[in-house]
Amino acid sequence: MGKPVEGATFAVEGFGNVGTFVTKFLTEAGAKLLAVSDSKGCIYLKEGIDYPKLMEVKEKTGSIINYPAAKTEPGSNIIHANVDILITAAIPDLVKTGDVNSIKAKLIVEGSNIPMTEQVEILLHKKNILVVPDFVANAGGVISSYVEYIGGDEKKMFKLVEEKIKKNTEIVLDSAKKNKTHP
């Protein structure tokens, strides 16, 4: 993407375990959440969505769609958000071939399992949209389970997840660049 996380805009598809943690992490790093979805729909706010307030709304009402002042849309619209980064964190087969030309994000991180086919990933690659594959990006659950198994605490878990995913992402992206292929 060539842009630092601080100041980048992002959207998160799915606001469960993966979605809430990635939102917390990115907002703490200085990124700006513009859109988020859950099973009830998608919200968009160009001024940005406040993470603590979003968590409060979800805990009190059961859904992110009750966030005040946000524009509410069908959940599937999340992939068309005008953001730098799109995080998929819920459903499989989210991005279809017909969606490719309307995607505005320059980086897609597959936090969910199989959010698109390899054919879609190739089409996105041809549009210079970087896709971090699901087998790299959503390994956090396995790493977390390992840390729990060895008796580690939450701090150790987050540190190890960050280290391993960052390292593995760099390896996959460097290999793709070297071999002139998509990750």
Residue ranges and their predicted role:
Residues 9, 31-35, 62, 84-85, ...:
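Structural motif
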Residues 87-91, 113:
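Short glycine-/small-residue-rich Rossmann-like dinucleotide-binding loops
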